[in-house]
UniProtKB/Swiss-Prot annotation:
Pathway: Secondary metabolite metabolism; lignin degradation. Keywords: Calcium, Cleavage on pair of basic residues, Disulfide bond, Glycoprotein, Heme, Hydrogen peroxide, Iron, Lignin degradation, Metal-binding, Oxidoreductase, Peroxidase, Signal, Zymogen. One of its GO terms (biological process) is response to reactive oxygen species. Ca(2+) 1 binds at D76, G94, D96, S98. GO terms for molecular function: diarylpropane peroxidase activity; heme binding; metal ion binding. The keyword Heme applies. Binds 1 heme b (iron(II)-protoporphyrin IX) group per subunit. The lineage of its organism: Eukaryota, Fungi, Dikarya, Basidiomycota, Agaricomycotina. Depolymerization of lignin. Catalyzes the C(alpha)-C(beta) cleavage of the propyl side chains of lignin. Its EC number is 1.11.1.14. Residues 1-21 form the signal peptide. This is Ligninase A.
Length: 372
């Protein structure tokens, strides 16, 4: 379903909320653990939740397994092309789990390199609990985000039929793509515009890279990869000064901090006139970051699906912890200041931020998942 159609469907559902309140109340059910959900079928997901929190996310951590689970949501969902369908070709099924079902094909596509590890970790849970791969990928991504302090309350809907064929190659953006290419790709996938593209990249706040630089694994995009905050949008605007590893890799540019990686697409989107002001708008604005990402994550997880035929099981997703009280929403890391910022937004000045005390240090790598 095209993104604008999705927005219309969501708006219609919201407009009917009051009128259908009595019906919704009757449908609500109490699960065996005492939790109340919007539909009795959602209760089974609490068992999945307990299992993956303990045995996939290492007791509910915002670590490598969580980061890769979030990445998997995007790579599964964005593989849909109405433009290809209009040409009589199969354009992929969007958020249908095809990347896991056809794990001998899609993980071998260049932008998906490295996702085989999280797919192999997730598949036993899919088989154990008898859920569809598409639903599990969306669920694991939402739970993963809930483990990251500062993240929004994530939505989760069930009702995805398993994919019947793999998505075609070439539908997942690459780190070396131009801004024009990426905007065109997300517009084709769901009629997303350049602002909504920036919202998607909020996920890089809790992310790391394993396969851009083959010499170094677990390189984060910002200095707080375990917290869903706007540091990613601050630090990608720092002047590039070094490579954290070998350098000269396709899709990588110099980063502004030791131990931190910067991919070409993030660098150019932070500086392009079409996206720079939206990029900067997240700096020191946690409420906007949270609300925009909550919206775009739901839209991504429903690409290729009919929202009206799905069941809202968002009650199962935990509420994330707040950002630690000893940190501001946005800040300059030790040793950094306004003089390090390459501001690209011509409309508004860069927000005034405090510089944390102490000496400049290298950003720590993210340990890989066990067995990876």
């Amino acid at each position: 379903m095209a993104f604008k159609q999705l927005v219309a469907a969501i708006s219609l559902a919201l407009s009917l909320t009051t009128a259908n309140a009595a019906v919704v109340k009757e449908k609500r059910a109490t699960c065996s653990n005492g939790a109340t959900v919007g539909d009795a079928s959602c209760c089974a997901w609490f068992d999945v939740l307990d299992d993956i929190q303990q045995n996939l996310f290492q007791g509910g951590q915002c670590g490598a397994e969580a980061h890769e689970s979030i990445r998997l949501v995007f790579h599964d969902a964005i593989a849909i092309s109405p433009a290809m369908e209009a040409q009589g070709k199969f354009g992929g099924g969007g958020a249908d789990g095809s990347i896991m079902i056809f794990d001998d094909i899609e993980p071998n596509f260049h932008p998906n390199i490295g996702l085989d590890e999280i797919i192999n970790l997730q598949k036993p849970f899919v088989q154990k609990h008898g859920v569809t791969p598409g639903a599990f990928i969306a669920f694991a991504g939402a739970v993963a985000l809930s483990n990251c302090p500062g993240a929004p309350q994530m939505n989760f809907f069930t009702g995805r039929a398993p994919a019947t064929q793999p998505a075609p190659d070439g539908l997942v953006p690459e780190p070396f793509h131009t801004v024009d290419q990426i905007i065109a790709r997300v517009n084709d996938a769901g009629e997303f515009d350049e602002l909504e593209l920036v919202w998607m990249l909020s996920a890089h706040s809790v992310a790391a890279v394993n396969d851009v630089d083959p010499t170094v694994q677990g390189l984060p995009f910002d200095s707080t990869p375990g917290i869903f905050d706007s540091q990613f949008f601050v630090e990608t605007q720092f002047r590039g000064i070094l490579f954290p590893g070998s350098g000269g890799n396709q899709g990588e540019v110099e980063s502004g901090m030791a131990g931190e990686i910067r991919i070409q697409t993030d660098h150019t989107l932070a500086r392009d006139s079409r996206t720079a002001c939206e990029w900067q708008s997240f700096v020191n604005n946690q409420s906007k970051l949270v609300s925009d990402f909550q919206f775009i994550f739901l839209a991504l997880t429903q690409l290729g699906q009919d929202p009206n035929a799905m069941t809202d099981c968002s009650d199962v997703i935990p509420i994330s912890k707040p950002i630690p009280g000893n940190l501001p929403f946005s800040f300059f890391p030790p040793g950094k200041s306004m003089k390090d910022v390459e501001q690209a937004c011509a409309e508004t000045p860069f927000p005034s931020l405090v510089t944390l005390p102490g000496p400049a240090t290298s950003v720590a790598r993210i340990p890989p998942p066990p067995g990876a």
